[in-house]
Amino acid sequence: MISYLEGKIEYSGDKFVILNTGGIGYRVNIVPKLLNSLSKSQDKVKLFIHSRLNMREGTFDMYGFDKQEDLDLFHLLTSVSGIGPKNALKLVQQYKSFD
């Protein structure tokens, strides 16, 4: 399991970044508020990671957070029946707007 990734942002999309760690680019889904703060940084960034293998869709998704507490909240939310990773990410975004 991947706990965190540290590297340089090579590309940022609407809701994700591609993080270059040692020559390998990882696509990491993040909340837009974090995207805005990370896109201004040229230095290395560290993202705490939740990884998810979706067998039905055949995808491997990663969700990144700048704080361990946000990742813990994400894990708590996804443990609730009916809340998937995408909805949990939206709820974490709402929580971060109070920071």
Predicted regions and their residues:
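Short coil-to-beta-strand transition motifs
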Residues: 1-5
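Conserved hydrophobic positions within beta-strands
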Residues: 7-9
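Long, highly charged, low-complexity intrinsically disordered interaction regions
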Residues: 11-98
